[in-house]
């Protein structure tokens, strides 16, 4: 049985239906995706992918990876594994096991800079149908911390590698899973809102609204309807010192634009996890002050969260990024704050 990937409605978590053949089975896309001319979808954001209900004993996917730099996380009935993709087009056995009803989830483990991944089709000996669309939805706009950069590294002294990145082990994915919520993760390693850690614009000021990093087509963000929005930016902006009023102006503008698009969403501005000293203090002040200003002006659904992380085993991953325990601690902090403000 062949299921072609056709994006219906371009809405987060909406099932994909074949508009030409009524008997074609469906899958549900996770995160942002772009339609490929001739069939299929293109993914590039970390943690994006698909989920399906398979009645059968196997599932195979035809995938095109741009450079062979990406890994996928695979979850079948709660059991997790990972595969490294090859450059070019190849067929991958997602699972092969006992006949029955299986829930299959496939997501990008690696970052946006690893190039695009095209999902052309999936095949099964049985049927493929979309899983149910969760009512709870989260949008996270972030950087390397939210995409799980180096999270599985031994300590802060290891150098980053694709093998040590795992978006599913980063706090956005952990929180979304804890609330059974869909996650729309928009993150770029090394990118800031006002300025990037290295390199020239564009920044997340532009990227936050795009379908993919390499596809400037505006994402129809008004169709996503997240109840919770996390802005996890600032570390790269303040990495080389205080960027000044340009950052605070862009931060306020981002919140205001998100508020227009999502009038009832709770917006959380988070900070912490990687910087220290004056850089940390400047970033914390800029973000908390901006949020306090908006709250005073009448937006009661905007909140500031500070991640405080004590030194402990697995505090650090590669290149001084948060490790496994740090990501889990950030997830618990965010869960507590969401519980306080959101009726989930």
List PLM regions with ranges.
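Structural recognition of the beta-strand scaffold that forms the well-ordered cores
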Residues: 137-141, 146, 183-187, 227-232, ...
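Surface-exposed acidic, glycine-flexible loop patches that form ligand/cofactor-binding
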Residues: 128-131, 214-225, 256-262, 296, ...
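Sec-exported extracytoplasmic/periplasmic mature domains
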Residues: 146, 180, 184, 234, ...
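Bacterial N-terminal signal peptides
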Residues: 6-17
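Short, surface-exposed connector motifs at secondary-structure boundaries
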Residues: 55, 263-267
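Catalytic His-Asp segment of secreted/periplasmic serine-dependent ester chemistry enzymes
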Residues: 273-344
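N-terminal secretory targeting modules
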Residues: 2-3, 17-141, 145-167, 342
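Conserved SGNH/GDSL esterase-like catalytic core that processes O-acyl groups on lipids
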Residues: 45-48, 56, 88, 105-116, ...
